[in-house]
């Protein structure tokens, strides 16, 4: 397996990341240090476009993170996250909607 990673991925602070080889990561995502996208059965998470993931987040297998979602620091994501939601905690729960374009490192297509 090889993880599929879209363009514009930003990795903040150069900290360690663990990304399972079956993960799918969309365009213009922002990962903080100590992020884990794990799976025991090679069925890792699907992370859609423009997602922000805070530091020390763990995303378990068979989870889909919707476009524009934000995952708070230290969260453990065990269930799907709807698009444009902010989730925090262990297990992560939605606390509010977000409707802004937080990720500004978009590549220009020529």
Q: Could you tell me what each predicted segment is?
A:
Residues 1, 6-7, 12-21, 26-27, ...:
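Left-handed beta-helix
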Residues 85-106:
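Conserved beta-strand-loop-alpha-helix hinge in the C-terminal portion
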Residues 108-110:
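Alpha-helical subdomain
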């Amino acid at each position: 397996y090889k993880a599929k990673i879209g363009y514009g991925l930003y990795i903040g602070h150069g900290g360690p990341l663990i990304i399972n080889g079956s993960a799918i990561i969309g365009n213009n995502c922002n990962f903080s240090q100590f992020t884990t996208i794990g799976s025991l059965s090679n069925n890792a998470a699907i992370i859609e476009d423009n997602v922000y993931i805070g530091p020390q987040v763990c995303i378990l297998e068979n989870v889909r993170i919707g476009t524009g979602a934000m995952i708070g620091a230290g969260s453990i994501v065990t269930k799907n996250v709807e698009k444009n939601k902010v989730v925090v905690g262990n297990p992560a729960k939605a606390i509010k909607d977000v409707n802004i374009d937080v990720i500004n490192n978009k590549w220009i297509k020529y």
